[in-house]
């Protein structure tokens, strides 16, 4: 009789894979090709085996079912186009590092897509996210889960069926909206003690349908629920800057956490076709409105990171925009904040992954994360062993940087969920 592997030789992912039952081949495919990468990222954060089991089980139960309506771009009859990743996948992974690499955290980004998304039954793909949130509300382990903000903002910033009918009838949506009909996506932070749920909304269609400018729509909806807990002057400074510089557009996102309102931050996201240092500097300082010591120290760190990465500066987005995605930005405001926390997302998609990894390794060492810097390139290769890092250009999608007085340097690296999916790397 041949020898059997000891259970202790198996990883949590391997143990779970032995006994999982899948309701469809599609769900089994997502587990086989995306959960393994997730397991590698969870290990990277120094999670315990118990946490790895917990997070992978959550992925199986509450993330994979969100992709029943996903079809690759080359599949005939595709009814819904997702827009949350440069690759076209409705799934994205990222790892957050702050202060020291021991404080790492995995985040999973998801666009819920039902099998009816884009059809007459669910033309703007609202059904699946409601179904997922209702399911999550029954999970006892999500102790802080709260839907108050979702109920408010989904009504205030997303279209109703009547508004969608009006948009379709008046044909006010440009052809480019074949992808951007999406109005919401989700994020799951795998924290030490529980999973925290985030919501991302795209309010451009609500603004079109209602005839309300985005600046006014966002300000009114935030004041209506937060009242004075989100500092009005701080919010107004950010809103006025974005409005005056034409940064409110079809790519504007709004985000919040599904936790009690008194604890939840808000975030405004956007994209900029000018991937240049001068533009990043302007966004970081909110057009020079904030030049305090903390803001400027963070800017100095950002410049170091910028110079270490193989960034291609563009004053305008090239015609091959899918291959050269724009720079992203975000402003985070927590209850009581007098200064917004900026974040710059440097596009990594279609930059050489070896050069990106080398630049990140050098930066990690500069900020004191020596172990992470020494191991980064090898760990990246171990997650994607079939990819030659010197030739690949799709493993890093975004490199996000922020800095606060409390947390210091805060990095968030976004990755391709799996190299097994059918699109060109």
From Swiss-Prot:
It comes from Penicillium ochrochloron. The gene is ptmE. Keywords: Transferase. Pathway: Secondary metabolite biosynthesis. CDD domains: PT-DMATS_CymD. L-tryptophan binds at residues 83-84, 92. One of its GO terms (biological process) is alkaloid metabolic process. Substrate binds at residues 107, 198, 200, 265, 267, 269, 345, 410, 414. The lineage of its organism: Eukaryota, Fungi, Dikarya, Ascomycota, Pezizomycotina. This is Aromatic prenyl transferase ptmE. PANTHER family: INDOLE PRENYLTRANSFERASE TDIB-RELATED, PRENYLTRANSFERASE ASQH2-RELATED.
């Amino acid at each position: 009789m041949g020898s059997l592997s000891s259970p202790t030789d198996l990883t949590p992912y391997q143990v779970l894979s032995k006994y999982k039952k899948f309701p469809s081949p599609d769900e089994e495919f997502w587990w086989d090709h995306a959960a393994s990468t997730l397991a590698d990222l969870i290990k990277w954060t120094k999670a315990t085996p118990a946490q790895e089991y917990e997070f992978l089980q959550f992925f199986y139960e509450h993330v994979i079912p969100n992709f029943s309506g996903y079809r690759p771009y080359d599949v005939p009859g595709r009814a819904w186009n997702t827009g949350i990743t440069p690759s076209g996948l409705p799934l994205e992974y990222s790892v957050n590092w702050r202060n020291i690499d021991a404080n790492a955290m995995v985040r999973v980004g998801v666009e819920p897509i039902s099998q009816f998304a884009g059809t007459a039954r669910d033309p703007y793909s609202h059904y699946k996210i409601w179904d997922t949130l209702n399911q999550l509300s029954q999970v006892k382990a999500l102790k802080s889960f709260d839907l108050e903000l979702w109920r408010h903002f989904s009504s205030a910033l997303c279209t109703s069926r009547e508004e969608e009918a009006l948009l379709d009838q008046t044909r006010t949506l440009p052809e480019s909206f074949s992808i951007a009909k999406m109005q919401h996506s989700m994020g799951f932070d795998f924290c030490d003690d529980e999973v925290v749920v985030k919501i991302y909304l795209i309010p451009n269609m609500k603004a079109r349908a209602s005839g309300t400018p985005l600046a006014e729509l966002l300000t009114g909806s935030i004041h209506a629920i937060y009242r004075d807990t989100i500092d009005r002057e701080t919010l107004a400074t950010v809103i006025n800057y974005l409005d005056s510089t034409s940064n409110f557009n079809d790519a504007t996102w709004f985000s919040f956490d599904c936790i009690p309102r008194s604890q939840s931050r808000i975030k405004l996201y956007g994209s900029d076709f000018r991937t240049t240092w001068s533009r990043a500097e302007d966004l970081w300082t909110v057009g020079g409105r904030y030049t305090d010591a903390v803001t400027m120290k963070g800017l100095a760190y950002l410049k170091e990171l910028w110079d270490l990465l193989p960034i291609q500066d563009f004053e305008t987005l090239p015609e091959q925009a899918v291959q050269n995605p724009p720079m992203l930005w975000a402003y985070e405001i927590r209850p009581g904040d007098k200064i917004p926390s900026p974040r710059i997302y440097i596009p990594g998609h279609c930059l050489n992954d070896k050069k990106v990894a080398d630049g990140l390794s050098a930066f990690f060492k500069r900020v004191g994360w020596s172990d992470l810097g020494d191991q980064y390139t090898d760990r990246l290769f171990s997650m994607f062993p079939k990819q030659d890092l010197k030739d690949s250009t799709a493993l890093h999608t975004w490199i996000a940087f922020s800095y606060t007085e409390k947390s210091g340097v805060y990095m968030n690296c976004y990755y391709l969920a799996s190299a097994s999916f059918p699109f060109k790397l």
